[in-house]
Amino acid sequence: MITATALAILPLAAACGEEQAGQQPGSGTVRVEPPVTGTKWNIATVTADGTTHRTKGDAQIAIDPKTGKLGGRLGCNHVNATATVGDGHITLGAPATTRMMCEASLMDTERALLKLFDGKITYRIDQNTLTLTSANGTSVRASAAK
């Protein structure tokens, strides 16, 4: 009888404390963050020179894991650059952009976003939000496209 009781209690005891990282307590599901590469990221805000701005236009980026290239739009112009992804950081090459002129707010967004390029930046993904931060203090928050 004691053996049967112990066997009945054992699975219950083992289940205690089995929440996994990224899992909401009691939800029964594990949140899986999108990877930094192969995901289209819609840029929501950019912080440069101590000021945060919501992006204007269609600002988005994606890193192709096969080619090691970043491509996207900076609000007005298209951008391409090499992108080497490491543990918690990305090394971006010098950007190549198209040269269209757009309204001033779009060009301001673009100038701020270009401050991320040509160097090593850190990245973090939390709740489908990508945060990029450069050594010069420029940071970007972007959400995974659906």
List PLM regions with ranges.
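Lipid interaction determinants
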Residues: 1-146
